[in-house]
From Swiss-Prot:
Residues 23-135 form the sHSP domain. Induction: By heat shock. Keywords: Stress response. The keyword Electron transport does not apply. The gene is hsp18. Signal peptide: none annotated. It comes from the Bacteria. It holds the Pfam family HSP20. SUPFAM superfamilies: HSP20-like chaperones (SSF49764). This is 18 kDa heat shock protein. Belongs to the small heat shock protein (HSP20) family. It comes from Streptomyces albus G.
Length: 143
């Protein structure tokens, strides 16, 4: 048996009861980072211990939704938890994507408990040079 020597054990128990695990109707938020690398936005979500098959990524119009579920380890009917500090349940995060992003080309990778999405900037939104002509010449946009 594992012994806890934390003097705030009762506070921990009360906090866990008040912040119950997320459910599909009321999921818990997951931590994330977002940055831009050249012409791609990179969004990383911390999902340690989540089976990749339990991760759902949906894009509807410009709304990106990530949902994941982490259940208890092992066979629950034969396991008696002594210490349960890792969060369980459903985790979710929604992001509103700009119209300038190419939602058809989103890539998702899951490695070492981190889900990484790569969202490229749409070609139509990339910087272009406008050629200026003189007199009867016309202006032409080039990529």
């Amino acid at each position: 048996m594992l012994m806890r020597t934390d003097p705030f054990r009762e506070f921990d128990r009360i906090t866990r009861e008040l912040t119950a695990p997320g459910t599909w109707s009321r999921p818990t938020a997951m931590p994330m980072d977002a940055c831009r690398e050249g012409d791609t936005y990179v969004v990383s979500f911390d999902l340690p211990g989540v089976d990749p098959e339990a991760i759902e990524i949906d894009i509807e119009r410009n709304m990106l939704t990530v949902k994941a579920e982490r259940g208890p380890a092992g066979n629950a009917e034969h396991v008696r938890m002594e210490v349960a500090e890792r969060p369980l349940g459903v985790f979710s995060r929604q992001l509103v994507l700009a119209d300038t992003l190419d939602t058809e080309q989103v890539r998702a990778d899951y490695d070492a408990g981190v889900l990484t999405l790569r969202i490229p900037i749409a070609e139509r939104a990339k910087r272009r040079r406008v050629k200026v002509g003189q007199g009867e010449s016309h202006r032409q946009i080039t990529g």
